[in-house]
Amino acid sequence: MRQQFFAKSIIMAFMVFLTFGCNNKTDSSITIKWGETLAESHPSAQMAIRAGKEITERTKGRVKVEVYTGGQLGASKEMVEAMQIGAQEMLTEGVAQFQMLPSLEILEAPYIWKNPETFDKVVKSDIIEEFNKKLIESGNIRILGTTYYGYRHLTTTDKAVHSLNDVKNLKIRVPEVQMYIAMAEAWGSKPTPMNFNELYLALKQNVVNGQENPLPTINSGKFYEVQKYLILTGHIITARIVTINETVWQKISEEDRKIMLDVVNKNIEIHNNEIKSLENSLISEFEKAGVTVITPNVEEFRDVVLKSVPAKLESRWGKGLFERILQAQE
């Protein structure tokens, strides 16, 4: 009996040791799922892969980052919602997708940016920190860094667009965001909000007549395979943000937070340079693939949008914010 009791005691003690040992190990590390809608070949996805690996290595596994590209964790809207409740820990996404803070979308408003240089100046200013505080309050989401996604241009399946009149009644896929819908309506088009991951098939099956995205995204999404024309409208420079759930952030040590910020922003610089390089080289690549490239009357597109969209969305953005960002570029 004594031997049986002794044996059971040893087994129970061992099980307790394993339980507490496992708990201590779990408590000392955090696993982060970093989501991305774009294909693995896109510079933004590659940025996340590089940064995730480096964060894991430099924190010695205290922060383990797993990167999921190509919308594996869901569509944009689904991932933003998952971020709010902590079901997903990190996300790189366009600012307009964070609809719990409508004013944030102004960072990709049509024709608000003069050029990539003034964009870079503003996103490194106090304006971003103001948005960061508001996003933490409204969505429990923190901004770790802001990326340059590139100029957005229009593509069409079979319609050569040289002027504003050529896009009248054209069914254009836009993100599921009010601002994009308002822009396409100002052009006289028929905006068709659609999940990004459904876009290639929709273009192939002529569900929509066209779409708009930056050149690197047109490339990684292979939209040039199902689009005949590329129209260089340059209507939006999109800001995408690298974000983390605030509750998770507060569980990370100060030392590891510094590592994460350093790694993320270092890789953002690499990413931004890659995007700019691709913007310079991809047009000729698309032409080689059989795409006809058109430079339209850009002022027509710009003027009709600026006459209506900022005023229409001022209640969402906040009075005077559009003008403030214009002035910050001086």
Role assignments for model-derived ranges:
Residues C22-T118, I127, I136-E330:
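N-terminal secretory/targeting leader peptides
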